[in-house]
């Protein structure tokens, strides 16, 4: 009995396998990028009077509560609307540095912000933030609204991240209660 040899062209095989490979790649990429480093804000209120002092915390967590090699962040602000008076309660574990810089590169793609707090933490053993637990506070900003405060937005952008994680920042809208 003769063997059956179907005639399938190479092009037909590729056309058949391409959607399967694409679907598999999309499914698997979801597993690879499923872990995230998340940086957000925590504050009691977002409504402020002109010339009012306030405090806002910058908070870190991972989606899987896992440890990482660290993170670098930027907290962008509009210096015509608020002044950052001091940066307090920094997470000491793995702290690399904290400084205020002019936002000439417009990292947050927001033309209204002109400065940012640049901060970073690192652990070469991939054990950051250590025994702090999650979520954990990275730092607190002590700030004051301008005398003519009309509202502004704070933005967090990610400068560097653990290679095993995707990362996301956040925005916080601060509104003026002048005239209320």
Regions found by a protein language model. Name each.
Residues 33-180:
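Acidic, low-complexity intrinsically disordered segments
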Residues 17-23:
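Sec-dependent signal peptide recognition
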């Amino acid at each position: 009995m003769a063997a059956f040899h179907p005639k399938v062209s190479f092009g037909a095989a590729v056309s058949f396998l391409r959607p399967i490979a694409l679907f598999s790649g999309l499914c698997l990429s979801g597993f690879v990028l499923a872990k995230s480093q998340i940086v957000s804000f925590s504050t009691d209120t977002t409504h402020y009077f002109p010339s009012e002092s306030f405090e806002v915390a910058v908070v870190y967590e991972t989606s899987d509560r896992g440890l990482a090699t660290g993170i670098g962040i930027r907290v962008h602000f509009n210096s015509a609307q608020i002044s950052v008076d001091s940066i307090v309660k920094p997470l000491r574990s793995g702290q690399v540095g904290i400084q205020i810089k002019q936002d000439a590169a417009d990292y947050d793609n927001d033309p209204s912000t002109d400065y940012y707090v640049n901060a970073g933490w690192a652990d070469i053993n991939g054990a950051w933030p250590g025994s702090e637990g999650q979520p954990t506070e990275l730092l607190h900003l002590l700030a004051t609204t301008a005398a003519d405060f009309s509202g502004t937005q704070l933005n967090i952008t990610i400068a560097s991240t653990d290679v095993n994680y995707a990362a996301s920042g956040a925005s916080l809208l601060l509104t003026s209660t002048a005239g209320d």
